[in-house]
A protein has these predicted regions:
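Thiamine diphosphate
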Residues: 1-148
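Flexible glycine/proline-enriched surface loops and loop-helix/loop-strand junctions
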Residues: 151-152
Length: 152
């Protein structure tokens, strides 16, 4: 292990800020980001897509305060592959996306499953198709999460 690597590893052992002693009212995306930091997530790779963008915004500013690293990736595929690499490096890592982005991640998810690499992907579900709930509500994101991948 070279000097840069050992110094970097030491900096990632910082503890997250202590939870607030008072009760807080949080939106789901805020709670997700804070929970990940309190659980020890120290690497986040993401690509902005609504409705998960708030997680990416919060992680980009807060993870560095805990000694972690944030990377905005070129797309959702890169995000999934980056967290697989971070896990291989021994870091707790996650990404966040929504239905269309989760669809793009399927090959990487299948790869993580085959290599038994534990990863965390937050799939923030939309209320229905892209036009919203007034048109039709459905469960397609749940089906994609449960039955996705390419037959691996």
């Amino acid at each position: 292990m070279d000097k840069r690597t050992s110094e970097s590893a030491k900096s990632l052992k910082k503890n997250p800020p202590k939870p607030a002693k008072k009760e807080e009212v949080l939106q789901g995306n805020e709670a997700c980001a804070k929970g990940a930091l309190y659980a020890g997530c120290r690497f986040f790779a993401g690509y902005p897509i609504t409705p998960s963008t708030e997680i990416i915004e919060m992680m980009s500013s807060e993870i560095q305060k805990c000694g972690g690293a944030f990377i905005q990736m070129e797309d959702e595929i890169g995000s999934a592959c980056a967290i697989i690499g971070a896990r291989w490096g021994g870091k707790k890592a996650m990404t966040a996306t929504s239905g269309p982005g989760y669809t793009l991640m399927q090959e990487a998810i299948g790869f993580a499953a085959v290599t038994e690499t534990p990863i965390v992907i937050v799939n923030v579900q939309r209320g229905g198709p892209s036009t919203g709930q007034p048109t039709m509500s459905s469960q397609q994101d749940i089906y994609q999460a449960r039955y996705g991948r390419h037959g691996d």
